[in-house]
Amino acid sequence: MDIDQYMTDLGRRARHASRAMARASTAAKNAALDAVARAIERDASALKEANARDVARARDKGLDAAFIDRLTLSDKALKTMVEGLRQVASLADPIGEISNLKYRPSGIQVGQMRVPLGVIGIIYESRPNVTIDAAALCLKSGNATILRGGSEALESNAALAKLIGEGLEAAGLPQDAVQVVATADRAAVGKLITMTEYVDVIVPRGGKSLIERLINEARVPMIKHLDGICHVYVDDRADLAKALTVCDNAKTHRYGTCNTMETLLVSSGIAAALLPPLGKLYRDKQVELRVDAAARAVLADAGVGPLVDATDADWHTEYLAPVLAIKVVDGLDAAIEHINHYGSHHTDAIVTEDHDRAMRFLREVDSASVMVNASTRFADGFEFGLGAEIGISNDKLHARGPVGLEGLTSLKYVVLGHGEGRQ
């Protein structure tokens, strides 16, 4: 296969399809989503057979249980796909909305209209559910998309792509609006991220090594996040019960997600009251604690152990594991300084009953999501009321935080006049 020619052809077809998608009606887009949902229900057995072949090859390669779990299309996973498609269909269509329409002294009206981005390239690991999630969001937001999933899910993605194409055709929309890259060759990624003529934005959903590669090689703009080094700062004016709940959930609800707390900052004024019960809670849940000298002193006195001395590298680390770094700080200023220096601009939270301190934290912490008295685990498109998300961005342009339908659109200015000329 000539990868360069193959990817160029995908791009050309996607660009052509994007024009039809931009003018597609809400009814047609919803009909396509419903048709795909019904096709998945109808062909569940065939999908599972294709997926079983992918899973068998992954097992033969010795891939770990967590990887196999993400790859597997169980009955529950298929049901979740179907529910997700219907949920996206139920969301309000942002395309064509006009906002901020105002009369100007000249007599013209000026506003902004929400429009699709165009062609979105999505690069992700071997998770077949992302094929459906991404296709649904791109379709509803009026975009065409080129999907490049992990090589271990080739057969699963091909089977899903066939059903997506059928759904688009049934709704009178171009099948090229959703195309799945049908090769495991890594050169396909290299070509996709440089096709500025055909691709408007890349959304990578993968590990740190993938994101780092794309940062170095991509010519197409990206919506991305590299790390999720999330913090909770417990202020000395915090409610202790709230602090225990937030700190427990932020770390132990799920270890392997990008919105899990990786560093706990504790004000020196509340450390003696908070750390002993919290340390015992983490110990009982087998969370390894990497602590600074001040935290060690308090925890050791309370009989909490074992403890590992934290190094500077710990403040920079996204563990994605039952490991937590703990540091005692002098107060709010020190906490904000630490977060802005070591954090990844993803999600950070403060626990406090002091309104002024809470507002300072919200203003001064330079992250995509900033929270007061709530777990960092809430940084999620569904929890934020977006309905669904394509990913989370800790960049400042174009979208920031969980990226839902609106994040896959942009605004253009529209002017309504009555024959006016500029004086």
Swiss-Prot record:
It holds the Pfam family Aldedh. One of its GO terms (molecular function) is glutamate-5-semialdehyde dehydrogenase activity. The keyword DNA-binding does not apply. It catalyses: L-glutamate 5-semialdehyde + phosphate + NADP(+) = L-glutamyl 5-phosphate + NADPH + H(+). PROSITE patterns: PROA (PS01223). One of its GO terms (biological process) is L-proline biosynthetic process. Keywords: Amino-acid biosynthesis, Cytoplasm, NADP, Oxidoreductase, Proline biosynthesis. GO terms for cellular component: cytoplasm. It is found in: Cytoplasm. Its EC number is 1.2.1.41. NCBIfam families: PRK00197.1 (NF001221), proA (TIGR00407). PANTHER family: DELTA-1-PYRROLINE-5-CARBOXYLATE SYNTHASE, GLUTAMATE SEMIALDEHYDE DEHYDROGENASE. Catalyzes the NADPH-dependent reduction of L-glutamate 5-phosphate into L-glutamate 5-semialdehyde and phosphate. The product spontaneously undergoes cyclization to form 1-pyrroline-5-carboxylate. Belongs to the gamma-glutamyl phosphate reductase family. This is Gamma-glutamyl phosphate reductase. The lineage of its organism: Bacteria, Pseudomonadati, Pseudomonadota, Betaproteobacteria, Burkholderiales.
